[in-house]
């Protein structure tokens, strides 16, 4: 079957790889000159299934009000004047109760755990390189309340069979030796030994290279204008004066998927702006071993070979990609606080990207009401964590095979009432 994939981020390229391996003739289209040049370029580097959890959580609405007055707040909201933003935030608020949180976290962990298994198999099969480490993740708590709240997430981990260790502050250095210097600032941590890390952009670009060698075609520097439909079928992708045709089409444009599907399929995917710093390592014994997640500031600090990646925060501000100095200062503050000798912070590279987020935090993967239009988008802050599993799942569904995990609750059908966002005029390009 001829399949066109829209988007060359980590989710789009993973989809291309697995569809190619299933025997399909795959073409990937993107406006950028190469793979992983937008949202997949410089994310936090975590592959953390156990920490897969929606931003829509009990207590978040009240916390959001408090965060409005804090300099280093993990979440910020600025109205962009669109009805879609208001609807999306309202839907998110409706998911902030305990029942929805547990349901959403459960299916996110399910997909993320499966995805890590798929990545492990891919690594064994291809020996793909991406500065990957299998050293686990350590969530750090600064208050007793955070430490006590961890028991709620532990219940989900136990249900999913995810190994964990709840550590008092005196034991944190057993996992991350450099934290011995700052343990007095912390109340404890939750360690997930099976989690991994790696450079998402490096992985995506190497996988794209392997996919191309296997026969996948990449059409870079090719902005997409619109999908062309007739009845319940998509019959082409309009790119300037050219119409590219296939038997099936996969939407993996991240935050830009919603606008590109306007008038065809309503999906509630909204951009969640995040930031990162990439820092050269200064002192080896003062740097992280794997990944830590600061629960207070919602910031991850991840170890690559000779670099530290510091990423996090969430801004609900539309398609704004301005680099804000106060956000840089927050990232610098956290990494200096926890790893004061770890990196040359003054040499850091500052970056921002738009994560495609659904109100319930779970991606939309599967077929739409159009028989040949498929979705693989809305992974939020977990695109890297969920990419391989989502790609394999999509390939199985499109190929008519029974997937290895339950998938019905990942369909866009769970938003049956639909969203009707206005399509911004500047979004006629594609997104990776």
Swiss-Prot record:
Localization terms from the record: Cell inner membrane
Keyword annotations from UniProtKB, A to Z: Cell inner membrane, Cell membrane, FAD, Flavoprotein, Membrane, Oxidoreductase
Regulation: Is activated by the HinT protein. Is inhibited by D-cycloserine.
EC number(s) from the headed UniProt entry: 1.4.99.-
Cofactors demanded by this protein: FAD
Induction details: By D-alanine. Is regulated by catabolite repression.
Membrane disposition: Peripheral membrane protein
Entry function: Catalyzes the oxidative deamination of D-amino acids. Has broad substrate specificity; is mostly active on D-alanine, and to a lesser extent, on several other D-amino acids such as D-methionine, D-serine and D-proline, but not on L-alanine. Participates in the utilization of L-alanine and D-alanine as the sole source of carbon, nitrogen and energy for growth. Is also able to oxidize D-amino acid analogs such as 3,4-dehydro-D-proline, D-2-aminobutyrate, D-norvaline, D-norleucine, cis-4-hydroxy-D-proline, and DL-ethionine.
Protein name, per record: D-amino acid dehydrogenase
Gene encoding the protein: dadA
């Amino acid at each position: 079957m001829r399949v066109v994939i829209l988007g060359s981020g980590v989710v789009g390229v993973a989809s291309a790889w697995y569809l190619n391996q299933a025997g399909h003739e795959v073409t990937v289209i993107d406006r950028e000159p190469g793979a992983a040049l937008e949202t997949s370029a410089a994310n936090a580097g975590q592959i953390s299934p156990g920490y897969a959890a929606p931003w829509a959580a009990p207590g978040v609405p009240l916390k959001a009000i408090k965060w409005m007055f804090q300099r280093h707040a993990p979440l910020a909201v600025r109205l962009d004047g669109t009805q879609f933003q208001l609807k999306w935030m309202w839907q998110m608020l409706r998911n902030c109760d305990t029942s929805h949180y547990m349901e959403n976290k459960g299916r996110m962990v399910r997909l993320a755990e499966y995805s890590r298994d798929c990545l492990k198999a891919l690594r064994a099969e291809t020996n793909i390189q991406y500065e990957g480490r299998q050293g686990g993740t350590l969530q750090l708590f600064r208050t007793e309340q955070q430490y006590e709240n961890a028991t709620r997430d532990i219940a989900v981990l136990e249900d999913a069979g995810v190994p964990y260790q709840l550590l008092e502050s005196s034991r944190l250095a057993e996992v991350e030796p450099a934290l011995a210097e700052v343990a007095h600032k912390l109340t404890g941590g939750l360690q997930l030994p099976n989690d991994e890390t790696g450079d998402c952009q490096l992985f995506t670009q190497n996988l794209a290279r392997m996919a191309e060698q296997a026969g996948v075609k990449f059409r870079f520097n090719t902005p997409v204008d619109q999908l062309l439909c007739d009845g319940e079928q998509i019959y082409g992708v309009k790119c300037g004066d050219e119409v590219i045709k296939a038997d099936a089409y996969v939407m993996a444009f991240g935050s830009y998927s919603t606008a590109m599907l306007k008038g065809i399929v309503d999906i509630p995917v909204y951009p969640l702006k995040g930031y990162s710093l990439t820092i050269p390592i200064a002192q080896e014994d003062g740097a992280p071993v794997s990944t830590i997640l600061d629960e207070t500031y919602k910031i991850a600090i991840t170890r690559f070979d000779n670099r530290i990646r510091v990423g996090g925060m969430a801004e609900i501000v539309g398609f704004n990609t301005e680099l804000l100095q106060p956000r840089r200062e927050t990232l610098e503050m956290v990494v200096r606080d926890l790893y004061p000798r770890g990196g040359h912070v003054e040499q850091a590279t500052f970056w921002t990207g738009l994560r495609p987020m659904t109100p319930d935090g779970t991606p939309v993967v599967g077929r739409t009401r159009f028989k040949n239009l498929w979705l693989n988008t809305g992974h939020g802050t977990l695109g890297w964590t969920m990419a391989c599993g989502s790609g394999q799942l999509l390939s199985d569904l499109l190929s008519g095979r029974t997937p290895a995990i339950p998938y019905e609750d990942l369909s866009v059908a769970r938003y049956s009432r639909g969203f009707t966002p206005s399509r911004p005029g500047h979004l006629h390009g594609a997104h990776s």
